[in-house]
Amino acid sequence: MAMSSFLINSNYVDPKFPPCEEYSQSDYLPSDHSPGYYAGGQRRESGFQPEAAFGRRAPCTVQRYAACRDPGPPPPPPPPPPPPPPGLSPRAPVQPTAGALLPEPGQRSEAVSSSPPPPPCAQNPLHPSPSHSACKEPVVYPWMRKVHVSTVNPNYAGGEPKRSRTAYTRQQVLELEKEFHYNRYLTRRRRVEIAHALCLSERQIKIWFQNRRMKWKKDHKLPNTKIRSGGTAGAAGGPPGRPNGGPPAL
């Protein structure tokens, strides 16, 4: 009714369309209409009745709308989801909270750059140690050091702070045996030369030759020089009537 009153109060003019064969074929316009019908529309404006025209077109519009908008049968409802197994409990979908959003690329790089540095080399999380002894070398006590020398030291400067048994190498023993074969007693000059050649000290050369001479005498079953000299001195110092310390002559 509101639309009808609007059309009555306003000077409504029926839209003018050019004549077309489609309109005549579909009987939308009467066949007896002529081009003068469109030209004389304004003269018949006072006697135009929009209610009749609206009522005449309404059934066609409603029928077309009903024919185009005819809904089909409703789709079947989706099947319900299968129930979970008895051993598992249903879990609700986890939705990310507002505070757990991923950081921006710039914030991500700042977080990586501001990460704490790795701990020092000697710190152990299970056994924390003081900061002043973090990278300190382990203490080596005298009893932990190796006493026997099994390799030739070219940077040997001579002299030892503590007496120790020396383990000579095969090359050193071979050179000492060759020198002992030609001369069982060494002079100071020759001892220094051998010590520098074999990277040993003069004391080590002296002790080795002493031990080697004792072994040589033992192998050749020679009497000890000290015992022999002591017996000779005792025999020479006896009384004149008892030669060689024996009983007196009758």
Swiss-Prot record:
Region named Disordered: 1-133, 219-250
Compositionally biased spans, kind Polar residues: 1-12
CDD domains according to UniProt: homeodomain
Spans through the membrane: none
Keyword Phosphoprotein: yes
DNA-binding region: 161-220
Compartments where found: Nucleus
Pfam family, one: Homeodomain
Motif position, Antp-type hexapeptide: 140-145
Domain of life: Eukaryota
PTM sites of type Phosphoserine: 89
Gene Ontology CC annotation, any one: nucleoplasm
Gene3D superfamilies for this protein: Homeodomain-like (1.10.10.60)
Cross-referenced PANTHER family: HOMEOBOX PROTEIN HOX-B4, HOMEOTIC PROTEIN DEFORMED
Protein's name in the database: Homeobox protein Hox-B4
Gene designation: Hoxb4
